[in-house]
Curated annotation (Swiss-Prot):
GO BP annotation list: anthranilate metabolic process; L-kynurenine catabolic process; L-tryptophan catabolic process to kynurenine; NAD biosynthetic process; quinolinate biosynthetic process
Full protein name: Kynureninase
Source organism per UniProt: Pseudomonas fluorescens
Cofactor entry: pyridoxal 5'-phosphate
Function: Catalyzes the cleavage of L-kynurenine (L-Kyn) and L-3-hydroxykynurenine (L-3OHKyn) into anthranilic acid (AA) and 3-hydroxyanthranilic acid (3-OHAA), respectively.
Residues that bear N6-(pyridoxal phosphate)lysine: K227
A GO molecular-function annotation: kynureninase activity
Record InterPro entries: DegT/StrS_aminotransferase, Kynureninase, PyrdxlP-dep_Trfase, PyrdxlP-dep_Trfase_major, PyrdxlP-dep_Trfase_small
One Pfam family hit: KYNU_C
Disulphides: none
UniProt entry keywords in alphabetical sequence: Hydrolase, Pyridine nucleotide biosynthesis, Pyridoxal phosphate
EC number(s) stated in the UniProt entry for this protein: 3.7.1.3
Keyword Hydrolase: yes
Impact upon substituting D132A: Reduces binding to pyridoxal phosphate and strongly reduces catalytic activity
């Protein structure tokens, strides 16, 4: 059985361990929720102060030029591109994941309407993140052209669900509940064989697992920066479009930042060439600047190293939970196979919500998703092996003593 000393030894050998010092982590907290909101980079505080006091305070409107505000979305996109297998000039950091999905799904359906107008099906998973389903449903309803969602209940059913009626396959690479990771390349190839376009949501992938959009042959990708990329609460999302598709159609939110001649102030819209056309309105500079602090840390390592540690952390967590908590009603819902696992681990428990609240009370922060799913995120930039060991011991104590049954842990908060 793995001991705490074994975990201390793993931490001593961890080449990524020094990066933890670049994050502001509270004393007495084991943070296993970076899959929901990443920790604050230490540099973010000074960067925010510089943007507010210097660039805004002293530079005023001049900072759109002198501080490079105008091109910040594109510059950040170029830096983020290296983490997802994209190239310079193919990614912009802007808006929210929901808004960017609306843009790319609209564009994909418009492309398909010119190629195969008879296709009216959007294939996705029942367990996809709800906002993705809501956006697709709302767009289909708005278009009033007979588009329908075909919801698939398990990954194994996807190959049969994608057929000649499919216009778009819209999937999240790593499932937000289970941590199941799709084979992006295989499913994209299958989509293309059937004449469909593939949209990938990388919310739980970017900064967590290696992604190569070009190698996978993907058509569109979106994702957020506030999880593993540590961009801060509500930080801007990103959007990528295959160069073969990018200029075929305009995206529907034709704001002035996406205009080819923004300050010509022309009465009619003319989209920029390339990914800049996926910009819309004026960018939130203070928040965007925080994204760069997170990307600065990633520039000091590589995704292969992060993936190795992620798998080691999640392997250890699964092993320890199944040893320490074997007598309790815990069911692993995350795949054991490395090729199918993201960077978070989920266990089901009948009192999952209350257990998570009791853990938080003890300084171990995970989160809860309906129904009965306890999620634990492992961020290789700052999670240690010893923290994994300590967290499992605390979980075991809570289950042994039924601490979760206390009334205070039954109270439902608005955010779980």
């Amino acid at each position: 059985m793995t001991t705490r000393n074994d975990c201390l030894a793993l931490d001593a050998q961890d080449s990524l361990a020094p990066l933890r010092q670049q994050f502001a982590l509270p004393e007495g907290v084991i943070y296993l929720d970076g899959n929901s909101l990443g920790a604050r980079p230490v540099a973010a505080l000074a960067r925010a102060q510089a943007v507010i006091a210097e660039e805004w305070g002293n530079g005023l409107i001049r900072s759109w030029n002198s501080a490079g505000w105008r091109d910040l979305s594109e510059r950040l996109g170029n830096r983020l591109a290296t983490l997802i297998g994209a190239r310079d000039g193919e990614v912009v950091v802007t808006d929210t994941t929901s808004i960017n999905l609306f843009k790319v799904l609209s564009a994909a359906l418009r492309v398909q309407a010119t190629r195969s107008p008879e296709r009216r099906v959007i294939v996705t998973e029942t367990s996809n993140f709800p906002t993705d389903l809501y956006i697709a449903e709302g767009l289909a309803d708005m278009l009033q052209q007979g588009y329908t969602l075909r919801l698939v209940d398990s990954p194994e059913e996807l190959p049969q669900a994608i057929d000649q009626d499919t216009a778009v396959v819209m999937l999240t690479h790593v499932n937000y509940k289970t941590g199941y990771m799709h084979d992006m390349q295989a499913l994209t190839a299958l989509s293309h064989e059937c004449g469909a376009l593939a949209i990938w949501d990388l919310a739980h992938s970017a900064g967590a697992v290696p992604v190569d959009l070009h190698q996978a042959g993907a058509d569109y990708a979106i994702g957020c920066t506030y999880k593993y990329l540590n961009g801060g609460p509500g930080s801007q999302a990103f959007v990528w479009v295959s160069p073969q598709l990018c200029d075929l159609v305009p995206q529907p939110l034709s704001g002035w930042f996406g205009h080819s001649r923004q300050f010509a102030m022309e009465p009619r819209y003319e989209p920029s060439n390339g990914i800049a056309r996926y910009l819309c309105g004026t960018q939130p500079i203070t928040s965007l600047a925080m994204v760069e602090c997170g990307l600065d840390v990633f520039a000091q390592t590589d995704m292969a190293s992060l993936r190795r540690k992620s798998l080691a952390l999640t392997d250890l967590f699964i092993e320890l939970v199944e040893q320490r908590c074997a007598a309790h009603e815990l069911t692993l819902v995350t795949p054991r196979e490395h090729a199918k696992r993201g960077s978070h681990v989920s266990f089901e428990h009948p009192e999952g919500y209350a257990v998570i609240q009791a853990l938080i009370d003890r300084g171990v922060i995970g989160d809860y998703r309906e129904p009965r799913i306890m999620r634990f995120g492992f961020t290789p930039l700052y999670t240690t092996f010893t923290e994994v060991w300590d967290a499992v011991q605390i979980l075991g104590e809570i289950l042994d003593r039924k601490t979760w049954a206390q009334a205070q842990f039954q109270v439902r908060h608005s955010v779980t």
